[in-house]
Curated annotation (Swiss-Prot):
Summary of the function given for this chain in its UniProt record: One of two assembly initiator proteins, it binds directly to the 5'-end of the 23S rRNA, where it nucleates assembly of the 50S subunit.
GO biological process: translation
Single GO molecular function: rRNA binding
Organism: Pseudoalteromonas atlantica (strain T6c / ATCC BAA-1087)
A single cellular component GO annotation: ribosome
Gene: rplX
Keywords: Ribonucleoprotein, Ribosomal protein, RNA-binding, rRNA-binding
Assembly mode: Part of the 50S ribosomal subunit.
NCBIfam families attached to this UniProt entry: rplX_bact (TIGR01079)
Entry protein name: Large ribosomal subunit protein uL24
Record-stated family: Belongs to the universal ribosomal protein uL24 family.
Any Pfam family hit: ribosomal_L24
Length: 104
């Protein structure tokens, strides 16, 4: 089944501690139905130093995954959350915004 939200899509968080935040999808994890979104769901990770890899230790902040049901794609025309549909154009499956029918 095709994914409604893909990498580099602009999304808005609908639920959770980061509700209302906008971000760009960095990575899609289809097996778990989760996304990694830039600047959203930040967690602190305690990193152990590893001189062989040149990694310094300390506490780093990184993005954790968020479930796909807690986000919606943003329609650039309206700037609001929108739903996605699929249709065929010239024997090719394309995504479109349900509110205005424009292609994603």
């Amino acid at each position: 089944m095709a994914r409604k939200i893909r990498r580099d899509d602009e999304i808005i968080v609908l639920a959770g501690k980061d509700k209302g935040k906008l971000g760009k999808v960095l990575k899609v994890l289809p097996a778990a139905d989760r996304l990694i979104v830039e600047g959203v769901n930040l967690v602190k990770k305690h990193q152990k130093p590893n001189p062989q890899l040149g990694v310094t230790g300390g506490v780093i902040e990184k993005e954790a995954s968020i479930h796909v049901s807690n986000v919606a794609i943003v329609n650039p025309k309206t700037g609001k959350a929108d739903r996605i549909g699929f249709r065929f154009e010239d024997d090719k499956k394309v995504r479109f915004f349900k509110s205005d029918g424009e292609l994603v």
